[in-house]
Amino acid sequence: MMSRTESRYSSQRTWLLSMVVLAALWSISVQRATARVINDDCPNLIGNRDLYKRVEWICEDCSNIFRNTGMATLCRKNCFFNEDFLWCVYATERTEEMSQLRQWVGILGAGRE
């Protein structure tokens, strides 16, 4: 027969294990959903995450300059292949990097429909 202390310890351990499993499952589902959204925008993202981060940084800077949270989303639309991205390049004064940025956007968007 189990004592009261052993029973309480067993239930606490079961509860803790349940919470750890639920947290792990939630984390995995969030990561998959985030990756799916990013992959839908840029089909050639796998293996090019460093390029994506460099190009995305322009959109984040642009959003911070104008204090408009929707600006970053517009800038990233169609895997950075849009007028808003070009506008952000000019707004962040990175026109000297334009040829490099076009090359990176081309790599990220390769296979785009």
UniProtKB/Swiss-Prot annotation:
Database matches in InterPro entries: Crust_neurhormone_CS (IPR018251), Crust_neurohorm (IPR031098), Crust_neurohorm_sf (IPR035957), Hyperglycemic (IPR001166), Hyperglycemic2 (IPR001262)
GO MF terms held by the record: neuropeptide hormone activity
Main location: secreted
SUPFAM superfamilies xref list: Crustacean CHH/MIH/GIH neurohormone
Any single GO BP term: neuropeptide signaling pathway
Signal peptide: 1-35
Subcellular locations according to the entry: Secreted
Intrachain S-S bonds: C42-C79, C59-C75, C62-C88
One Pfam family matching this protein: Crust_neurohorm
GO cellular component terms listed in the entry, alphabetical order: extracellular region
Biological role: Inhibits Y-organs where molting hormone (ecdysteroid) is secreted. A molting cycle is initiated when MIH secretion diminishes or stops.
Stored PANTHER family: ION TRANSPORT PEPTIDE, ISOFORM C (PTHR35981:SF2)
Family: Belongs to the arthropod CHH/MIH/GIH/VIH hormone family.
Protein known as: Molt-inhibiting hormone
Lineage of producing organism: Eukaryota, Metazoa, Ecdysozoa, Arthropoda, Crustacea
